[in-house]
Amino acid sequence: MENNVIVFFLSFLSSVVFIEGFKRFQKKLRIGQYIREEGPDLHNYKTGTPTAAGLVFIPIFIAVLLNFNRGPESFLIAFSALSYGLIGAIDDFMKIKRKNASGITAVQKLFMQFTAAFIIVYFIQQINPHTYLIVPFSGYKLDLGWFYYLLSSVVIVGVSNAVNLTDGVDGLAGFVFIGSIVPLLIVGYQSVVYLSLIGLLMGFLWHNWHPASIFMGDAGSLALGGILATSFALNGLELFLIFFGFIFLLETLSVIIQVTSFKFRGKRVFRMSPIHHHFELLGWKEEKIAFRFSTLALLVSLLGIIGWREL
């Protein structure tokens, strides 16, 4: 218990202090976020806001995790954080270098993400060999054979990108992530991992609540998704991400629905996707979106805890 308290407060305080320094560093160099043209016009004023806070809180996460838990699972989660954080950092760097919102290409990003995912899945099989998915509420182990390796890799890449899609409104990705994982503390699953992340994200939100003075960037969002997916894949719990990553799944589905509908019907289902922009264009304030989405994330993840009881 004492270690858990230390993990949380160490993560929180480190995040608050070092992100503040990182903000000042970027302002001194006059670098910051470039807003994508296809996003809402409401966001244009955010151009130049410091970004890539993930470059601060992900290294802190790795240091805290490996200081308090040096088991093989922790090393693999740290590798996931590092690899996806680096992919995001490259993307953030290219945006700053090119002075626009275009980072690396989708093909380049997916290639790096799947390479990292294949490595992660390989080492998962060394740590905890399995080819099954545990079905929520039943505990049934659905054996997929060799197909599991591919599916698990797709899940890791998909969740990483889903968190990235959610990071489009001040405070949204951070609060939704916290709401999604807090219930895991009830069952004590990967306590050091999630206590550290909660502390770090609360520290980040100290600076990211509307109006945000810094964004997490791809370095943060891709890494958070990689951590979440890897921690579940370690034990065949990918299906539980339906509950513990519900909002991230919803955001991704909204993009798929929007693109598919426009391609085949010539009509848009939402005013803009991902879906948080739809509500933004309906007049919802950013604080309202962040609060309601994170509340929904918390409620759905609590349902996941009920299904967890069968494990």
From Swiss-Prot:
The keyword Transmembrane applies. It is found in: Cell inner membrane. It is an enzyme of class 2 (transferase). Pathway: Cell wall biogenesis; peptidoglycan biosynthesis. It catalyses: UDP-N-acetyl-alpha-D-muramoyl-L-alanyl-gamma-D-glutamyl-meso-2,6-diaminopimeloyl-D-alanyl-D-alanine + di-trans,octa-cis-undecaprenyl phosphate = di-trans,octa-cis-undecaprenyl diphospho-N-acetyl-alpha-D-muramoyl-L-alanyl-D-glutamyl-meso-2,6-diaminopimeloyl-D-alanyl-D-alanine + UMP. Keywords: Cell cycle, Cell division, Cell inner membrane, Cell membrane, Cell shape, Cell wall biogenesis/degradation, Magnesium, Membrane, Metal-binding, Peptidoglycan synthesis, Transferase, Transmembrane, Transmembrane helix. This is Phospho-N-acetylmuramoyl-pentapeptide-transferase. The lineage of its organism: Bacteria, Thermotogati, Thermotogota, Thermotogae, Kosmotogales. The gene is mraY.
